From Swiss-Prot:
InterPro entries: NADH4_N (IPR000260), NADH_Q_OxRdtase_chainM/4 (IPR010227), NADH_UbQ_OxRdtase (IPR003918), ND/Mrp_TM (IPR001750). It catalyses: a ubiquinone + NADH + 5 H(+)(in) = a ubiquinol + NAD(+) + 4 H(+)(out). Keywords: Electron transport, Membrane, Mitochondrion, Mitochondrion inner membrane, NAD, Respiratory chain, Translocase, Transmembrane, Transmembrane helix, Transport, Ubiquinone. This is NADH-ubiquinone oxidoreductase chain 4. One of its GO terms (molecular function) is NADH dehydrogenase (ubiquinone) activity.
C-alpha cells in the first residue's frame, strides 16, 4: 500500500514547490501517474501475501474502490481549473492540497485492517470535504450545506464508535481479517438489536438511506465541482464498503433486522426517482438520482447473497464514474450559462455538438443501457432481490422505467429545443473538457469488456 500512499504524500511538495503557471500541469501529471501505477491493483489475487499487513490490506472489494479514488484525483484537478481562475495562487495550492488530503484519507480508509483505524479515517475524510464545500462553494447557502453534512455524518457515526469500543472489550481485537472467525453469532436480543443498529447507522447516513438523505442534495448543489465529483463518486461508496465489511460480523442479525430498511430503500428508490422528474436544478437532479442508485446498493448489501454483493460492487463503481461525469457536464454548462436551471441551457446542442455527444453517453449509462456495467449491476441486484421476494420485481422494473424517464428528460431539456437568446455567444468546448469526459467514459467502456475484475469478493 505504501507504493500508493508515499507518492500521494509527495504530491504536497509537488504542489507547493511548483511555479505558479505549472501547478495544474505538474499536479495533474503526477496524480495521473499514481493512478496508472495503481491500476495493477485490479489484477490481483486475494490470497497473495503482498496484499496483507498489520495496518493495510487490499482484496477484490477494496481494490476497485481504491483505483476509482486514484483515478478521480487528476480528473478533479482538471475540472477545477476554470472555477479557480480568479483565485490567488496560494489558495489554488491550498485547494489542490485539500484534494490530495482527501485522496490519502480515502485510500487509507478503503485499505484499513483495524476497524478503529477505519473509523478514524472514515471521519477524517469529513474535514477536507467540509473545507472544500464551505470555502469554495458558489452561494452563501454553502455554510448551511456544510452544517447539514457535518452534523448528519457525526451524529450518525457516534453510535458506531460506542459499538466498536464494546466489541473491542468483548473480543480483544478489531482486526477485520480475524473478526469473522472469532466473533460469536449474535443472539436475538434487544442488546444485539441495538448493537446492529449502532454499527449500521453510520453507513446508512453516508450512503444515504432515504429519510437520512437531506444533507446530500444540499451538499452537492453548493459544493464546487471537485467537491461534487468526489462526494458522488467516492464518499457515498464509503457507506457501501463499510456495510459490506461490518455485516460479515453481524450475522445472523441482518436477516431479522434488515426488513424495515429494505422496505424504506425500495420505497425511497421510487420516491427519489420520481422527485428527479420534477427538478429544475440540474445539480439537484443528479444528486437525487445518486440517492436512488444508492438505495439499490443498500438493498443488495442487506439481502446478503453472493449475487447481490457482486451487484452492489459493480453498481458502486459504475455509479461513481457516471455521476462524476454528469457533474462535470453540469459544471461545463454552468461555466457558460452561469445558471443551474436546465431550461436556460436548452438548444445548446447546436452550439456545442461534441459536448452534446458526451451528454448522450452519460445519460445512457445513467439509465443503464445495455451493455454498460450499470445494467450488469442492476440485473444482479434485481435477480438477487427477486429470489428474496417476488414482489420486488415490480418495484425494480418501475425504478428502471423512471430512471430512463428522468435521464432522457435531463438530456432533452438541456440539449434540445429552441436556443435561448442569451446563449448565442458561448465559449466552445475546450480540449481539457473533452479529455475529462473521455477519461470518465473510457473506464466504463473498458469495464463492459471485462466486468469480472470489479465483481467483488464473492465472485
Amino acid at each position: 500500500m505504501l507504493k500508493i500512499i508515499i507518492p500521494t504524500i509527495m504530491l504536497f511538495p509537488v504542489t507547493w514547490c511548483s511555479s505558479s503557471p505549472m501547478i495544474w500541469i505538474n499536479t495533474t501529471l503526477h496524480s495521473l501517474l499514481i493512478s496508472l501505477a495503481g491500476l495493477l491493483f485490479l489484477n490481483q489475487f486475494n490470497d497473495s501475501n503482498n496484499n496483507f499487513s498489520l495496518t493495510f490490506f487490499s482484496d477484490s472489494l477494496s481494490s476497485p474502490l481504491v483505483v476509482l479514488t486514484m483515478w478521480l484525483l487528476p480528473l478533479m484537478i482538471m475540472a477545477s481549473q476554470h472555477h479557480l481562475k480568479k483565485e490567488p495562487w496560494t489558495l489554488k495550492k491550498l485547494y489542490i492540497s485539500m484534494l490530495i488530503f482527501l485522496q490519502m484519507f480515502l485510500i487509507m480508509t478503503f485499505t484499513a485492517t483495524e476497524l478503529i483505524l477505519f473509523y478514524i479515517l472514515f471521519e477524517a475524510t469529513l474535514i477536507p470535504t467540509l473545507i472544500i464545500i464551505t470555502r469554495w462553494g458558489n452561494q452563501t447557502e454553502r455554510l448551511n450545506a456544510g452544517l447539514y453534512f457535518l452534523f448528519y455524518t457525526l451524529i450518525g457515526s457516534l453510535p458506531l464508535l460506542v459499538a466498536l469500543i464494546h466489541i473491542q472489550n468483548y473480543l480483544g481485537s478489531l482486526n477485520m481479517l480475524t473478526m469473522s472467525f472469532c466473533f460469536q453469532e449474535l443472539s436475538n436480543s434487544w442488546s444485539s438489536n441495538l448493537l446492529w443498529m449502532a454499527c449500521i447507522m453510520a453507513f446508512m447516513v453516508k450512503m444515504p438511506l432515504y429519510g437520512l438523505h437531506l444533507w446530500l442534495p444540499k451538499a452537492h448543489v453548493e459544493a464546487p465541482i471537485a467537491g461534487s465529483m468526489v462526494l458522488a463518486a467516492v464518499l457515498l461508496k464509503l457507506g457501501g464498503y463499510g456495510m459490506m465489511r461490518i455485516t460479515m460480523i453481524l450475522n445472523p442479525m441482518t436477516k431479522y433486522m434488515a426488513y424495515p430498511f429494505l422496505m424504506l430503500c425500495l420505497w425511497g428508490m421510487i420516491m427519489t426517482s420520481s422527485i428527479c422528474l420534477r427538478q429544475t436544478d440540474l445539480k439537484s437532479l443528479i444528486a437525487y438520482s445518486s440517492v436512488s442508485h444508492m438505495a439499490l446498493v443498500i438493498v443488495a448489501i442487506l439481502i446478503q447473497t453472493p449475487w447481490s454483493f457482486m451487484g452492489a460492487t459493480i453498481l458502486m463503481i459504475a455509479h461513481g464514474l457516471t455521476s462524476s461525469m454528469l457533474f462535470c457536464l453540469a459544471n461545463s454548462n454552468y461555466e457558460r450559462i452561469h445558471s443551474r436551471t436546465m431550461l436556460l441551457a436548452r438548444g445548446i446542442q447546436t452550439i456545442l455538438p461534441l459536448m452534446a455527444t458526451w451528454w448522450l453517453l452519460a445519460s445512457l449509462t445513467n439509465l443503464a443501457l445495455p451493455p454498460s456495467i450499470n445494467l450488469i449491476g442492476e440485473l444482479f441486484v434485481t435477480m438477487a432481490s427477486f429470489s428474496w421476494s417476488n414482489i420486488t420485481i415490480i418495484l425494480m422494473g418501475l425504478n428502471m422505467l423512471i430512471t430512463a424517464l428522468y435521464s432522457l428528460y435531463m438530456l432533452t431539456t438541456t440539449q434540445r429545443g429552441k436556443l435561448t437568446y442569451h446563449s448565442h455567444n458561448l465559449n466552445p468546448s475546450f480540449t481539457r473538457e473533452n479529455t475529462l469526459m473521455s477519461m470518465h467514459m473510457l473506464p466504463l467502456l473498458l469495464f463492459t469488456l471485462n466486468p469480472k475484475i470489479i465483481l467483488g469478493p464473492t465472485y
